[in-house]
């Protein structure tokens, strides 16, 4: 706990291993009464969706809590107990970009679905902006592991916001307050 978190890069500059620090949903759940006694009324989580990195801003799957934090069911239990104590749970939804190692982009073929990087026929292809397919694409601050999405693409909007089972609606139903 006294050393600086680190990561190891490959020859091309890609991160191949991260150090991880921190707690999980069960740990927060165990401390809810204590947090309430301090006057806490809102808990804001940085990204907790499935992701290969320690910062979790390169989402792999918006439908799953990252296993290092717990499960979707544990998230629901946390929200239920927090609500009973008058504490709201707020999620950091990173919807301007995904991870290159995601079910949507799937650069490394780690997912069953055909990602935008793998095929022009992918249902996710139009979510991204390629300048020279497949290797050149718009990405967050030039970080290739975080390809930007076209936030106004109709199918992306439906998946994230407006669809009956959109990501936002799913997590609100699971107990998040925002």
Residue locations for each model-derived region?
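Receiver (REC) domain switch/active-site residues of two-component response regulators
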Residues: 177
């Amino acid at each position: 706990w006294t050393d600086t978190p680190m990561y190891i890069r490959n020859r091309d500059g890609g991160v191949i291993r991260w150090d991880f620090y921190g707690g999980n949903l069960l740990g927060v759940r165990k401390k809810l009464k204590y947090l309430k006694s301090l006057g806490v009324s809102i808990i804001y989580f940085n990204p907790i969706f499935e992701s290969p990195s320690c910062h979790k801003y390169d989402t792999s799957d918006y439908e799953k809590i990252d296993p290092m934090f717990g499960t979707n069911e544990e998230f629901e239990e946390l929200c239920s107990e927090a609500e009973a104590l008058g504490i709201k749970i707020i999620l950091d939804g990173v919807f301007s970009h995904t991870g290159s190692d995601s079910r949507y982009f799937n650069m490394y073929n780690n997912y069953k679905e055909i990602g935008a990087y793998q095929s022009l026929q992918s249902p996710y292809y139009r979510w991204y902006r390629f300048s020279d397919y497949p290797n050149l694409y718009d990405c967050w601050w030039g970080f290739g592991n975080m390809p930007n999405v076209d936030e106004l693409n109709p199918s992306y909007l439906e998946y994230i916001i407006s669809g009956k089972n959109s990501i936002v609606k799913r997590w609100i139903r699971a107990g998040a307050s925002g």
